[in-house]
A protein has these predicted regions:
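Alpha-helical substrate-recognition element adjacent to the catalytic core
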Residues: 1-129, 224-227
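Low-complexity, serine/threonine/proline-enriched polar segments
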Residues: 34, 44-49, 126-161
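Amphipathic coiled-coil/heptad-repeat helices and related helical stalk/stem segments
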Residues: 77, 165-166, 189, 213
Length: 254
């Protein structure tokens, strides 16, 4: 989600500032917490959020969703989903959208596009009887992101359903990898991109069209992590829109 659909980390678009930190200091302290304690970086930022909010901000699902309402989206994102789904339907292809993110599920659920996804896989909190977040419920990092691709492939979407480990015949796969398109922006997406690529699907790297910094997508292309790259402009008629429609056309032909 972050820097794929939105130009910045979701936590940095209101929450961090609301608890008295500047963004750079927050992430520096969070990363130091992780490295100094052999701690997952995502668990570290979640703990930092919880501790920083004490005495300054209600740390509830509702407040986190409010922060999500402030998250900016790249051009064209808001109407992308219906447009691409409609194009797919017109060409005999059922299109579904999923989120696999190391960001916060609660914030994503507060965004304008939350209802466009069949399933949101992201880090999230457990809440006590007062509705206050007290413990991580789920943490999604760059390596365990891949499990969700297998869940999507097999149609076993419940995160606690062990059926994802069952053996499926190729013709039983609900969404074969060859029909998947994975869009991401950085190294955290590499395991998923590689998995989709080697199984015949399509991985696309995106970069911020305003900064025009292609460093990460060039690196991913050189290392065969992605098949294509494009500016993160989701507007109709732009490069990404044209590319996705071409992939839908190819899928329909096969």
């Amino acid at each position: 989600f972050d820097k794929t659909l939105s130009p910045d980390n979701m936590q940095a678009q209101g929450f961090i500032q609301s608890v008295g930190y500047d963004v750079e200091t927050f992430w520096k302290k969070s990363n130091g917490l992780a490295s100094g304690n052999d701690m997952d970086q995502n668990l570290a930022y979640m703990l930092m959020m919880q501790q920083a909010a004490e005495g300054k901000k209600l740390f509830t699902r509702g407040e986190l969703m409010k922060c999500g309402k402030e998250v900016m989206l790249f051009p064209g994102v808001k109407d992308w989903f219906k447009r691409i789904c409609t194009y797919g339907e017109e060409h005999g292809v059922l299109v579904e959208h999923y989120i696999i993110s190391s960001g916060l599920k609660e914030m994503i659920e507060g965004t304008d596009v939350a209802g466009e996804f069949k399933k949101i896989y992201a880090s999230s909190f457990f809440y006590n009887e007062k509705g206050v977040a007290i413990w991580p419920a789920q943490v999604v990092n760059y390596t365990n992101k891949t499990q969700f691709l297998f869940r999507i492939e097999k149609g076993v979407l419940d995160i606690n359903d062990p059926g994802v480990n069952d053996s499926f015949a190729p013709d039983e796969m609900r969404v074969p990898f060859r029909n998947m398109v994975y869009i991401g922006d950085s190294d955290t997406d590499v395991p998923c991109m590689k998995l989709v690529n080697v199984n015949g699907g399509y991985s696309i790297g995106v970069y911020n069209a305003d900064t025009k910094d292609k460093t990460k997508v060039y690196k991913m292309m050189r290392e065969n992590r992605i098949k294509y790259y494009a500016p993160a402009d989701y507007s109709e008629g732009k490069e990404l829109d044209i590319l996705l429609k071409a992939i839908i056309d190819r899928t329909a032909e096969n």
